[in-house]
């Protein structure tokens, strides 16, 4: 239990909600959040290094070129969640991610296009029960991404992605991270 709490705290204190503009890191968060569908976040955090190794340290160009042989190899690899649909979707999503980069100049710019003021939203919640699972921005972005062919990226996963990458600041009012983000 302590190691789990330690891993969560380190992620919360050092990464979660920290503004990300780098497309490689955004792709990493997209992959990890998608992998989490139906699972606990701690499961994915524990396997994060495995995901980095399995998916070329989130080099989107290399991931997009992965083959059926790579998929079969990953189905035997304990470093990630061995779910064929999720592995396939990671490769598919990489190809679509690249298409968005070409269309918008970067995935960061694409993501920001769903925010009317072109900047992060800072919410002022006092309790966890106030934090929503989705938002109008996550609804619109996930709808657009699904239309483009992305898999495992519904509005709830999209909202978690937006939180993780700092597009939505949902640190509670009494959280020390609130002031530094």
Model-found features: residue ranges?
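Short, small-residue-biased leader/transition segments that mark boundaries at the very start
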Residues: 1-2
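A short, charged helix-loop
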Residues: 10-13
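Short, aromatic/basic-rich helix-turn unit that serves as a nucleic-acid recognition element
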Residues: 26-43
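Amphipathic alpha-helical segments within well-ordered protein domains
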Residues: 31-35, 52, 72-75, 91, ...
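Non-catalytic DNA-binding core/recognition domains of DNA-processing enzymes
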Residues: 41, 45-54, 86-94
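Alpha-helical ds-nucleic-acid-binding substructure associated with the helix-hairpin-helix region
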Residues: 57-134
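Catalytic DNA-binding helix-loop module of base-excision-repair DNA glycosylases/AP lyases
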Residues: 111-132, 136-181
